[in-house]
């Protein structure tokens, strides 16, 4: 089960659902709110540091005026963050509320396990 952020932050319903699905799928241990960049304060919602794999949960995509991830500048900032992560060797799986399903999470957990095996070769 992923360790939760210790700073008393509110854990979203989307994050709680992800944790349940990830646990059921037998996914490897994750760190919540992992700061991955050496100079920026960017964080991944969940990360497997040893495999450099991360989960991003994009809530609010279907709100009438869009959430942060669906607005112009939010999308621009997300792109900047994801490019920087790729430059550092990270792989990222993104989920919205609609695509956070047991099947999708199970497939992602399998990909994480394969990435962990590749890193140990």
Task: Identify the residue ranges that each predicted region occupies.
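Nucleic-acid endo/exonuclease domains
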Residues: 1-121
